[in-house]
Amino acid sequence: MDDDASMSIRWGGFFESPARNLGLQLMSSVPAERDTKQLLSGSPFLHHQHQQHVPHHHHQPHHPRDCGANGNANGGAMPPPPATEAPPSMPMNFARSDMWMHPQQQQQHHHPREHKALHNLTVGHGSSHIAHHDPVGYGMIPGTHTLQMMQQQTEPQLQPPPPPQQPKEECISSPLIEENVPVIDEPPPPKKRQQGRQPKVPRAKKPKKSAAPREDGAPPNAPAPRRRGPRKNIGMVINGIDLDLSRIPTPICSCTGAPQQCYRWGAGGWQSACCTTTISTYPLPMSTKRRGARIAGRKMSHGAFKKVLEKLAGEGYNLNNPIDLKTFWAKHGTNKFVTIR
């Protein structure tokens, strides 16, 4: 059983060497050290075919690692391979490096999607191709990994393009602000329209004139009392005689047997305080429709009262005496809801 647990079984196919100088020959002269292992050197077929053509044999040093790799199942050490074996004359120009690796080594050193690489190594003046042995796999130089070789070949192709240059405005770095320096908030610049105009100067307010003192002694700032207009002179001409109704005494009503003064109603009209069209009593009862008010008595308008005066003046009645309106109330009824207290 070999170092890579391959059971000395070779499954790879070997073909003739392609054209030389493929750019894969990394080292021109490498001495055959103790780590060098000949590919397919133990094959009985090749040993039988080319044993007679080998003039002399090369001595291969024994190493304890080779004994451990060729040990039997019981743990016993197998003897080293005979020194009489010679490298085959059949050229082996290239070997598969990762094909002979153990699955655990492949997981440690390679990604499962990486492709297999073929390496061609030329050693010596006779251009004989020898596959060097390394714990990584056959056909590789000790200490060299397949991925490193591939990176050396693809370095000029895998260089990333230079990043695009940013515009000058973005490259300008913001000014550094110290921690202890207080930040002063500057007001925003005025608008374009305001830049062309001159700032307005506030006008000076005119001083107020002091109010002159009043004649009645009231303070000057006190509101003036509202004056009432001249009182209208309610007068009428009856039979060529001017009468002032303001000087005529208040009419009365004697429907209850006792004279009761009437109430003013409207502009120059009168209202009874003791009788309605159905009731004649003093005082009138309280209204059931309006709280706090009494039933309104019979009414007489200003025009109707004027006609009464004209009639009495024609008969020679003295208007300086109170007029009894008991017989002059309207018989059809003109009562309205008027508050009488």
From Swiss-Prot:
Biased segments, Low complexity type: 68-77
Region Disordered: start-end pairs: 48-95, 150-234
Classification via Pfam families: GAGA_bind (PF06217)
PANTHER family recorded: PROTEIN BASIC PENTACYSTEINE3
Function of the molecule: Transcriptional regulator that specifically binds to GA-rich elements (GAGA-repeats) present in regulatory sequences of genes involved in developmental processes.
Family: Belongs to the BBR/BPC family.
Protein name per the record: Barley B recombinant-like protein A
The species this protein was found in: Oryza sativa subsp. japonica (Rice)
Source lineage: Eukaryota, Viridiplantae, Streptophyta, Embryophyta, Tracheophyta
